[in-house]
């Protein structure tokens, strides 16, 4: 074997070892996005909810700024309950359908049912809550105490 081949093989092995330490991405985020789109047909894109208020997006603290932000806090709390049940809500994949009357869950295990119900409840809550552009990308260090 040529020295260059050994170097390439070594580089691949080192890369794979490094990749094994990387945390997995939230797999059901895509499903949650589709549930939001199904519940909010013709409305704003789901990414508008990723940095809204004190609770929509990563983390959360303080008092929700409005009804929509309360939807996100309830969703966070629901995921917290799922974790207490031994579920991994950000990694749990589930089955759902987008019917003419909106999304609904159709899944088998307790964790899948619970996590899908959390996401479904949030998506429907988003659909009925007004969106205030002033609460998008707020300074959480000042407004979320």
From Swiss-Prot:
GO terms for cellular component: extracellular region. It is found in: Secreted. Ca(2+) binds at residues 55, 57, 59, 76. SUPFAM superfamilies: Phospholipase A2, PLA2. GO terms for molecular function: calcium ion binding; calcium-dependent phospholipase A2 activity; phospholipid binding. Pfam families: Phospholip_A2_1. The active site is at 75, 119. Residues 1-21 form the signal peptide. Gene3D superfamilies: Phospholipase A2 domain. GO terms for biological process: arachidonate secretion; lipid catabolic process; phospholipid metabolic process. Residues 22-27 form a propeptide. Expressed by the venom gland. It catalyses: a 1,2-diacyl-sn-glycero-3-phosphocholine + H2O = a 1-acyl-sn-glycero-3-phosphocholine + a fatty acid + H(+). It comes from the Eukaryota. Disulfide bonds join 38-98, 54-144, 56-72, 71-125, 78-118, 87-111, 105-116. Keywords: Calcium, Disulfide bond, Hydrolase, Lipid degradation, Lipid metabolism, Metal-binding, Secreted, Signal. SMART domains: PA2c. Its cofactor is Ca(2+). Belongs to the phospholipase A2 family. Group I subfamily. D49 sub-subfamily. PLA2 catalyzes the calcium-dependent hydrolysis of the 2-acyl groups in 3-sn-phosphoglycerides. This is Basic phospholipase A2 cL037. It comes from Laticauda semifasciata (Black-banded sea krait).
